[in-house]
Structure formats: C-alpha cells, structure tokens
Amino acid sequence: MEMPIIKLKNFDGPFDLLLHLIKKNEMSITEIKIHEITKQYLEYIALMKELDLEITSEFIVMAATLIEIKSKSLLPKVKVEDETCEEDLQKILMEKLQEYKKFKKISAYLRERELSTGEVFTKKAEIIEVEVDNKLDDDYFKNITMLDLYKLYNNLMRIYGEKQNVNVMEKKISVDKYKITDKINFLRDKLSEKSIVRFSEFIPQCECKLEVVVTFMAMLELIKRSEIKVVQYENFGEIMMEKVIVNE
C-alpha cells in the first residue's frame, strides 16, 4: 500500500495557518471551536518538523496560546477572575485574527494592482527645441495657481473616464500619433478663431487619455512661450485660455 502524499501549504505566519484551519472547518472567526482548531494546529506544526521546515517562534507562541485557552476552557471555573482572563485572552486573539485578515485582503489587492501596471505603457518624452523667454509676467496666470491647474488635469481625467469605457485599451498606440507640436498648432488655430476659449471644449474630441494629456501639455507649452495666458474669472470656475496680443 502506497503512503499518501501530504502537501503542506507555505503559510506566511501563525495567523495565516489559523485562518486556513478556520476556513477548512467552515467556522466563523468569532465562533472558533478552540479544541478542534488546537488539535489540528499542533498536527500541522508536527508535520512541519517531520518535513524539516523552519518553524519560527511565532508559530510556537500561537500554539501555546491556543493550548492555554483550551486548557482554561476545560478546567472547572473556580474563580470569576480566571473566567475573565480566559475570555479576554480569546477576545484578544479573535481581534488580532480579524485585523490580520483585513491586512491580508489589502495586500492581495495591492499585489493585483501591481500586476496590472504591466498593462500600462508610457510615451517617450518629446523634445521641443525653442528659445523661451523665462521672464513670465504673473498676468499669464491670472487668478490661477498651480493647484488650480492640478485640479483641472484631474477633472479632465475624471470627465473623460466617465464618457469612455476605461476597461478597453488599445493594443497598439503609435508613438507619433499624438504629438505636442501638433496640439500646439491645433490650439493656435482655435485661438485665431476666438481669442478666448475654454480648455474643456477640446476634451470631448480626444480619442483617449493620452491625447487629453498631450493637449494639456500643449497648453502649458504655449503658456511657457508667452503665447497665451490662462484666466479664471471666478473661484472654482472654468479655466479659460486667452491669446496674448503682442504690440508691434
């Protein structure tokens, strides 16, 4: 007769093993049958020793705690103090176990998010060679702070995300499909038609988030070149782009 093959899960710690046993026995964390869990817990530790696996002091401490709770539950209740001590010990264990379960769930979510970053691709930086006058007048940012621009960008991402299916991603995006130089010329053309325009007007025309970002960067580049200024006529109002008229 062949010996059964025993597979031992690689547990992250004593709480991980305890959660496994609770799930296996279909128990609730708040209604653990200590006598059943303790027996199985000790069997797992014994199996670890047989397989020459490293057993940390944390596993031993947890086993001792379970044995203590079990022994106190079997002994006659002579004093009320002992009963309180037993209940407190078990309560502390349950609270720690529930807290561990929460962190385990969060770590699994973060691991999933980390893996999903592999689906994100960035565009190479586009070098724009131009002579820039670094002496910008404050009037180019009339009633607008960097925080306002940051909020504008986040709002644009949110608005675009609500109108598009964010779960659908293009398999291939050409590096030269959205260029800052093209968007600069696009904004120049629009400002030649109207001297003042709302930046948000251009977002519905964008095909993807990358195009929104490139358009936003084109606006910043035009501000840097002193060709436009951005204005906010009221608190929390829309950010307007205004063409700068150069006096000849």
UniProtKB/Swiss-Prot annotation:
Gene Ontology biological-process entries: cell division; chromosome segregation; DNA replication
- Does Cell division count among this protein's keywords? yes
Compartment(s) where it occurs, according to its Swiss-Prot or TrEMBL record: Cytoplasm
Which InterPro entries would you find in this protein's record? ScpA, ScpA-like_C
Where on the tree of life does the source sit, at the highest rank?
A: Bacteria
Keywords, comma-separated and alphabetical: Cell cycle, Cell division, Chromosome partition, Cytoplasm
Gene Ontology CC terms, in alphabetical order: cytoplasm
Pfam families linked to this entry = SMC_ScpA
- Report the protein's function: Participates in chromosomal partition during cell division. May act via the formation of a condensin-like complex containing Smc and ScpB that pull DNA away from mid-cell into both cell halves.
How does the record describe its quaternary structure?
A: Component of a cohesin-like complex composed of ScpA, ScpB and the Smc homodimer, in which ScpA and ScpB bind to the head domain of Smc. The presence of the three proteins is required for the association of the complex with DNA.
Q: Which family does it belong to?
A: Belongs to the ScpA family.
Enumerate the HAMAP family for this protein.
Answer: ScpA
> What is the official name of this protein in its record?
Segregation and condensation protein A
Query: What is the originating organism of this protein?
Result: Clostridium perfringens (strain 13 / Type A)
The organism's taxonomy opens as: Bacteria, Bacillati, Bacillota, Clostridia, Eubacteriales
Gene designation: scpA
